[in-house]
Amino acid sequence: MPRNPRFCFFLFLLFHSSLFFSIPCFSIDEQGLALLSWKSQLNISGDALSSWKASESNPCQWVGIKCNERGQVSEIQLQVMDFQGPLPATNLRQIKSLTLLSLTSVNLTGSIPKELGDLSELEVLDLADNSLSGEIPVDIFKLKKLKILSLNTNNLEGVIPSELGNLVNLIELTLFDNKLAGEIPRTIGELKNLEIFRAGGNKNLRGELPWEIGNCESLVTLGLAETSLSGRLPASIGNLKKVQTIALYTSLLSGPIPDEIGNCTELQNLYLYQNSISGSIPVSMGRLKKLQSLLLWQNNLVGKIPTELGTCPELFLVDLSENLLTGNIPRSFGNLPNLQELQLSVNQLSGTIPEELANCTKLTHLEIDNNQISGEIPPLIGKLTSLTMFFAWQNQLTGIIPESLSQCQELQAIDLSYNNLSGSIPNGIFEIRNLTKLLLLSNYLSGFIPPDIGNCTNLYRLRLNGNRLAGNIPAEIGNLKNLNFIDISENRLIGNIPPEISGCTSLEFVDLHSNGLTGGLPGTLPKSLQFIDLSDNSLTGSLPTGIGSLTELTKLNLAKNRFSGEIPREISSCRSLQLLNLGDNGFTGEIPNELGRIPSLAISLNLSCNHFTGEIPSRFSSLTNLGTLDVSHNKLAGNLNVLADLQNLVSLNISFNEFSGELPNTLFFRKLPLSVLESNKGLFISTRPENGIQTRHRSAVKVTMSILVAASVVLVLMAVYTLVKAQRITGKQEELDSWEVTLYQKLDFSIDDIVKNLTSANVIGTGSSGVVYRVTIPSGETLAVKKMWSKEENRAFNSEINTLGSIRHRNIIRLLGWCSNRNLKLLFYDYLPNGSLSSLLHGAGKGSGGADWEARYDVVLGVAHALAYLHHDCLPPILHGDVKAMNVLLGSRFESYLADFGLAKIVSGEGVTDGDSSKLSNRPPLAGSYGYMAPEHASMQHITEKSDVYSYGVVLLEVLTGKHPLDPDLPGGAHLVQWVRDHLAGKKDPREILDPRLRGRADPIMHEMLQTLAVSFLCVSNKASDRPMMKDIVAMLKEIRQFDMDRSESDMIKGGKCEKWQPQPLPPEKIVSTPRGSSNCSFAYSDESV
């Protein structure tokens, strides 16, 4: 029978195809079994891999599995699962066909198995965003076909192996946000195909960027930010013809930017900020026609800004601030049509603002403050209709504020303070509906405040003080419902304070002092007010009873006016009042007893130069926190016994009254100069000796009516007084000439009582300037006595006296007195029995409060209150300079007291604008304690109160984690701040960093701790200007316990209600910096270190 050729051919195909398909069937089963075995070794929670079943013969249909055209497993891709354990690799070795292994965000721990190096077909290995530790195994670098290696966001340690050069096909290498150390291997130059290299966020990565990096000719992204790379950028970087992003910010680079950078013609983003780069900006950058973002701020760049930058048409962000640049702002910047942000603050630029900038119609941020720019503001600025921020404060600008500025209807903040501007404020400025901040203080502006101000309904902060403004305060100001802060002091305003001001329902701060205002105080004022200064005007009438409704008021200054009548008793409802100054007015009647019912009255009470009669109210004995009392130049009578127990009094003036009787026999009154007692003809000094102290017999002496009339008597009294004081303190006649003693409280002891107890057995601590002893005096009272390290410690000794001797706060250690001679300097404080916060946290403290969150919260809130008082309530402000857990002492109920003011500094307000004190003075950096010092201590940057804020943030982290900032157990010798930052950058559970003694608490308590963690991160921002002010920190901490508990922990760790302070994390390719200067936030760094 003849054969059919077609039929034979069909049988042939059928036979061979059955052979072809029969072989993989066994192979697939084998790979399926290997995968099931691998799954069994994973600690998987839930049913994430429920589709992986032995009953399914074909694994190609399983979740996360892909096969090639031959039915072999080629890809394993599993994401966002919870494996909770190490990565097993033994079974994976059997899947030789595997080309892609991606296990991201699956909570892998342990080390990377070296067996992965046997997967010879592997092209993609992605183990990012896990908790892998240990070193990168060298075996990985045997995978010659590997194109993508992603190991970022883990806890990997060790060095980057030099075998990296074997991966000649590698296209993408991401190692960022680990704990890698050592240098970048020179073998990286072998990777000719490498397009992406990101190893930022490895703080211990050091050495120089190798020259060989220039051999990576395919490189598109080079990200090595937030490392310890040092030295110069190699000139070979110019060989990277395809590179689009170079991110090497927040490192230790030095030397100049190489001219060869101009050869990188594809470059779009250059981020070199926060280094120590010197030299000038290369002219060759003008060749970078695709450049979009140029961030070089906070370096040591000098010379002129090259005109050639104006030939980079794609530029939209230029930040060269905080350098040493000189010369003019290039006119060529007007050729940049896409420019959105130009930040040149804090340099030494001169010349004028170029009119050509008006061509940059997309400009949103123009910040040129803190330079030496002169001339007028060009009228063409009105063409910048997209402008939202215009900061030009602290320059030498002259002329008028151009009316055309009102055409910039998107403006939100204008700060032209500290210039020489003149003329009137353009009416049109108040037609800018989005304007929230208008700061024009310290100029020569004149004219009237226009009624148009009422149209500016979003205005939040208005500072016009220190000008020559005249006329009335317009009634339309009452339309500003959002106004929080108004300062129009030191002008020439007249007329009444408009009653419409009561409509400013958000108002907290009002300063109108030193004007010519008349009329009375409005009967109704905003209940939100915290600060009122109307002193040095011509206001009349009586105080309205409505003053009692201001329950948030802390400071009220009405001095140097013409007020009359009696003080309303309703003032006692001002329960937060700390300072009350009614001096130099025409008040009459008796001082109301109700003033003694204000427990917060601690800073000052001034009722001098009025017509008060009667006696000092008996309730004044309750003002135990009061520091300064002035009732001089009145018609007060009676005795002064009611003041005898005011132990916190530092200053008292009762002169020119009609007081009589015996002066209280206390040390404070015995030390008062006669000038504060004079013209009280019925007043006399006690003749009774003090118990236990040898005294010279004195006759009763009438206090003189006038120093001029009884000059000789005064001199005799002063001489006797001086001798008696020295004799009482020392108890030794032979030491009368050697010791200088000042006591602020009544203390019965001799110098010998103190000195003999300064032994090693009584040491309770050490500070930055001395050692502290516990000393019990004969009366049984226990003191803390600090002995300065050496007689050369004059600065620290004087700092303690000058600072603590003039301030009072419930959370600041109380200085009881001091003494010194040529060889010894001693300071006397209240003794606090529970040691320091440091000893409480780290095992040596008394009591069991160390593990209690509520106690820790109260401690840090108290310290925040103390620092806020120093920074914002003291005039001038005070910097502590050494905030650390050791300097936070604990009272009998574990209440906190800030101590050790040996490094404290008085801060001049010169050069400060809008309360932003990030640039207060040019003094050299302060000393501090290692581990707590802010980054600016390591450079020539200004040290400000924001440095205290950083140290406070470290203390917060110490309280939350229970770890010392330099805890030797932190991996890789990391600092506490970096350890926490790395943990959170790895998107790990923030609860894991909490002190084990704090974990396992109820959800509301955990919420509090996580929110406090968010506050601490604001405090430890690398840039001082990014850190909040202490008064805002207090507000945030107080708000935490009233926080909406429905918010998620992830929201809170990003800032919670504090997020208005949080720098917005953006990948570098999308960075648009936020303003510095007058605002309190600025671009800091990307959340993803590149």
Swiss-Prot record:
EC top class, as a word: transferase
Keyword presence, Metal-binding: no
S-S pairs: 60-67
GO CC terms, sorted: plasma membrane
Gene: RGI4
The keyword ATP-binding appears for this protein: yes
Motif extent (CLE45 peptide binding): 269-273
Lineage: Eukaryota, Viridiplantae, Streptophyta, Embryophyta, Tracheophyta
Species of the source: Arabidopsis thaliana
Localization in the cell: Cell membrane
Residues carrying sugar: 43, 107, 263, 359, 420, 434, 455, 606, 653
Enzyme Commission no: 2.7.11.1
Binding residue positions for ATP: 764-772, 786
Modification comment: Autophosphorylated. Phosphorylated and ubiquitinated upon interaction with RGF1, thus leading to activation a subsequent degradation.
Quaternary organization: Self-interacts. Interacts with RGF1; this interaction triggers its phosphorylation and ubiquitination and the formation of heterodimers with SERK1.
Bilayer topology term: Single-pass type I membrane protein
Residue stretches in coiled coil: none
Residue intervals passing through the bilayer: 703-723
Chain spans, region Disordered: 1054-1079
Active site: residue positions: 882
Name of the featured protein: Leucine-rich repeat receptor-like serine/threonine-protein kinase RGI4
Catalytic activity field: L-seryl-[protein] + ATP = O-phospho-L-seryl-[protein] + ADP + H(+); L-threonyl-[protein] + ATP = O-phospho-L-threonyl-[protein] + ADP + H(+)
Entries under SMART domains matching the protein: LRR_TYP, S_TKc
Disrupted gene: phenotype observed: Smaller root meristem size and fewer root meristematic cortex cells, associated with shorter roots and a slighty reduced sensitivity to RGF1. Insensitivity of pollen tubes to CLE43 and, partially, to CLE45 peptides-mediated growth stimulation. Pollen tubes of plants missing both SKM1 and SKM2 are fully insensitive to CLE45 peptides. Quintuple mutants rgi1 rgi2 rgi3 rgi4 rgi5 display a consistent short primary root phenotype with a small size of meristem associated with a total insensitivity to RGF1 and undetectable levels of PLT1 and PLT2.
